[in-house]
Amino acid sequence: MDLVGVASPEPGTAAAWGPSKCPWAIPQNTISCSLADVMSEQLAKELQLEEEAAVFPEVAVAEGPFITGENIDTSSDLMLAQMLQMEYDREYDAQLRREEKKFNGDSKVSISFENYRKVHPYEDSDSSEDEVDWQDTRDDPYRPAKPVPTPKKGFIGKGKDITTKHDEVVCGRKNTARMENFAPEFQVGDGIGMDLKLSNHVFNALKQHAYSEERRSARLHEKKEHSTAEKAVDPKTRLLMYKMVNSGMLETITGCISTGKESVVFHAYGGSMEDEKEDSKVIPTECAIKVFKTTLNEFKNRDKYIKDDFRFKDRFSKLNPRKIIRMWAEKEMHNLARMQRAGIPCPTVVLLKKHILVMSFIGHDQVPAPKLKEVKLNSEEMKEAYYQTLHLMRQLYHECTLVHADLSEYNMLWHAGKVWLIDVSQSVEPTHPHGLEFLFRDCRNVSQFFQKGGVKEALSERELFNAVSGLNITADNEADFLAEIEALEKMNEDHVQKNGRKAASFLKDDGDPPLLYDE
């Protein structure tokens, strides 16, 4: 053995494993490997490992028991296999049900394949879409207690402890339990933990009321969708209000400011009305949107205000209920226009769209002007308000030829030191068959309010009626006064039927007080 290096055998010498054969008959030269080179390579490798150990210290690894095949937990694998098998079985059962349904068809006699199903005994509740809560409800306080049955003989107990089926306590508890059978919309309350007892009379009344409300809600379901009974905003009304905002006429609608029996008033900020005409209306900065309710529940008893009005008499009987409500809005628009021309403080009409009337807002910064009923006035301001009201009533009667017909402290606003009149949808002309009666009622409301307010100069209702109308009815009591008013109305109605409305005008050309009939 050569210590210097290991050399390959010469070409002529045969190797121990046999001569190497080359397919091209060319001998291969074996590269000689020196022992010194091998040792140098090993030394360099050791030095490299030492340097790496110095730069990257070895992290101590906690020694622990090696995981062997005996310690591996295979329960998850078993569960996975069971779940896969359950899915396969469910698919098989579903296919079996389809085959069963196809095999039976529409036959009245069917054959069941249930015995061939692959159902697991531990199949959980997830197999069905409807989850079932298997909690114990034996002690559930919200579960209605099972009533104690009464035997056929009709009583329980003996002697003094006998209890019949007509016992007040037993019947009261049974009636309380029966309230759970009412419709879900009927709120019966929560009686958990309380021993409630209802008498038969009370239970029967509640039962009848619940049934009647259920029938009523079912009957008015569709009508409610098309009415404005609640907040006066149905889908059609919302669409109209949306179009007003979308067109730019209104900038925004802030909210409701007043609610009444016949209408609801909303506050809105005015926009700009783009119109090619030069005389287009200027929209105020703040507007009031009056929406008339489209149900006739509140208008059935108020048709006398519009049925006998000559301006709408011919149109009233030809319209459906919804168009009658539009007529109310149109009537208020015309009345406000008359008052505006006469210079009476009132809202200015901006736009009328079906049963929606847009007017100027009386107030400031979304705060409406207070009513005379709500405002606190001193004696001088109250006296000034009375004289303004008296002047407005005379001006409304003579210059506008109108009677408010619902004038009271609730329909008069106090703003900027003046009295403003609102809500004139029911106002009629004095030629109305009941025009003078409405005027007398207005005088009564105004007189009583200011007399209670401490205005000593306030006239009585009969004196105020004569002062406003210009008539001189001398009657000692109210009954005779009303009788003369009805007689004048009857004579005026006959005169109108014979000679027409123009011949029975209340205003003379010479400015004298109005007359109900020609003398």
Swiss-Prot record:
Active site: D406 (proton acceptor)
Binding site for ATP: I257, S258, T259, G260, K261, E262, S263, V264, V265, K290
Renumbered residue ranges of the record's region Disordered: 121-159
MF term (GO), any: caspase binding
Organism the protein comes from: Homo sapiens (Human)
Composition bias type Acidic residues, residue spans: 124-134
Required co-factors: Mg(2+)
GO CC annotation terms, alphabetical: cytosol; preribosome, small subunit precursor
Name of the top EC class for this enzyme: transferase
Designated name of the protein: Serine/threonine-protein kinase RIO3
Reactions performed catalytically: L-seryl-[protein] + ATP = O-phospho-L-seryl-[protein] + ADP + H(+); L-threonyl-[protein] + ATP = O-phospho-L-threonyl-[protein] + ADP + H(+)
Keywords for the protein's UniProt record, in alphabetical order: Antiviral defense, ATP-binding, Cytoplasm, Immunity, Innate immunity, Kinase, Magnesium, Metal-binding, Nucleotide-binding, Phosphoprotein, Ribosome biogenesis, Serine/threonine-protein kinase, Transferase
Post-translational changes noted in the entry: Autophosphorylated (in vitro).
InterPro entries: Kinase-like_dom_sf, RIO-type_Ser/Thr_kinase, RIO_dom, RIO_kinase, RIO_kinase_CS, Ser/Thr_kinase_Rio3
